[in-house]
């Protein structure tokens, strides 16, 4: 185990390039969430829902934004104050105190199978039983995990991290600093079939590629299919969660986020800075503009041309959903009022009948 690191609060502030308030000699040797932090931990407040813990936490220091420091700075606590985004400073603390766990298999393991035509860069790690097929190209300082397969003519850029049991099929192009979690399959054939006169389904050849640009992250057991003729493309900086299905010839823009179990059907184009909530389904052959947020379990059946928050099935603006939900919640009271009106109408009807038969 690595030796425990200890910083004074002032040393930590200097490393993070932030302001410090409180006892600058407080020793800090670890990180923890605000509700469980002890005296040797640094923690942070990112969500105001957890502000109640500021008074009771035992943390040696709390990372706050300047706005938060104005609200809570009067408390007798040690604070590290950043301009904004405490979670970013906290992530830097995590990197300081917690080193990644090494697999223990440096270099190229003797059980790895590497085709003689493959090109392997400098300082590459290829773990046991990984397979690198013909004419594949692995960039410098890239890591290929145990049992992973890199297909023929596929390329990976520098500083990529391919975890165990990943399959990268043939002719896939992957940029720099891409992270692929275990079980992901990149470049499988799309779900394209033609049905003949006898009702039998015949699979169509898919000749396109999958192109993954720089700084993309792909979650565990996520699948990205190649296009039939054109390429499936994941643009720079996009983050994809676990168990996401991206069909043939889909294009996802820059710096978007796709949450677990979402599915995007073929030939759909997703814009930049789009957030797709968990279990969202998006039909094929449509486009989603930039800066759209889709809530969990949204069903998107038509193109979205205006930025904003959408939800429901079929997808519609959040404000519209909010109004509809409010009306639904009022239905029991409306039903009660309707029942009372019906009773009054019955009473009035009975009185009218009595008046009609009175001589």
From Swiss-Prot:
Annotated SUPFAM superfamilies: Trimeric LpxA-like enzymes (SSF51161)
EC number: 2.3.1.191
GO biological process: lipid A biosynthetic process
Stated role: Catalyzes the N-acylation of UDP-3-O-acylglucosamine using 3-hydroxyacyl-ACP as the acyl donor. Is involved in the biosynthesis of lipid A, a phosphorylated glycolipid that anchors the lipopolysaccharide to the outer membrane of the cell.
A Pfam family hit: LpxD
Keyword terms of this UniProt record: Acyltransferase, Lipid A biosynthesis, Lipid biosynthesis, Lipid metabolism, Repeat, Transferase
Protein name, entry field: UDP-3-O-acylglucosamine N-acyltransferase
Pathway: Bacterial outer membrane biogenesis; LPS lipid A biosynthesis
